[in-house]
């Protein structure tokens, strides 16, 4: 079965890692059926990519019980903490899956996702790491395929480089729309509450060092 062995610890909301071969075969059993088969409802789905400990996914799920949340990370040991917290607090509208982010289009059907959060990803600053930036054109194209027509993407990062890089890409795209942009969300007013009310462990470390936190909300 697909449920991971960690389910034996009372964590039925963690799904095992899908191998690249399994996903590329196109036979992932929940593709196009996450809401119905996993969440047992028809609510919209929000993804958190590179979810780390799952802090953002869990808190967003707690605040938005009528939305389904899925955290994705290649390292399952990271989000085990988030899954445990969700289990302890009976937050049943958040799940986690261990998978490579570049394979999202094999995990989800076209138009299956309503919103994406990318929180504090590695900015991959060197040129040779461009292909690994989670907001490069190739990744944006993958996100566009799984987002519905009104779907949006949120990028929250301490990297002014990644913030500027992403804005530059969006401004050069024909159909992209920047809904909100702020290069220092805690110093400048007007930030969406979901961008400032939830702080991850690492975000608090950045803030303690007076590092600005940037945020962009956009459509593609």
What are these regions (language model features)?
Residues 135-149:
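A short glycine-rich, Lys/Arg-flanked "PGG" loop and its adjoining helix->strand segment in the class I
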